[in-house]
Amino acid sequence: MSRKIFQRQEYSIYRCSDGFVVHNTNKKFENGHTHVNNFYKAKILVIMAIKREIDDKLSKRDIESLIRLTNDNRYRNQLRDLLERLE
């Protein structure tokens, strides 16, 4: 069983047995969550999703996580463009 340890706006972070789960509570859990290994990374993803920040230093995995978390179509398209440039 996981326990919520942090929330900012619509994003919640849960502690689970294998790390942390970030969930956008405005989306269904299946489509709006991602798993990360540490709390710091989870908070960074939440802050980036809220501020709709793009960073060229993001890993492919982080970009995919932000795509899953965000509701903003414009931001999602910018992230997809960045992901295509990395591939």
Can you say where each PLM-predicted feature lies in the sequence?
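Residue-level detector of alpha-helical secondary structure
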Residues: 43, 47, 51, 58-60, ...
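A short, exposed loop/beta-hairpin motif centered on an aromatic-Gly-Thr core
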Residues: 25-45
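Short helix/strand-capping connector loops at secondary-structure junctions
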Residues: 23-30, 59-63
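Short, well-ordered helical secondary-structure segments
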Residues: 2-3, 37, 41, 54, ...
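Short N-terminal "domain-start" leader segments
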Residues: 1-21, 30, 56, 71-86
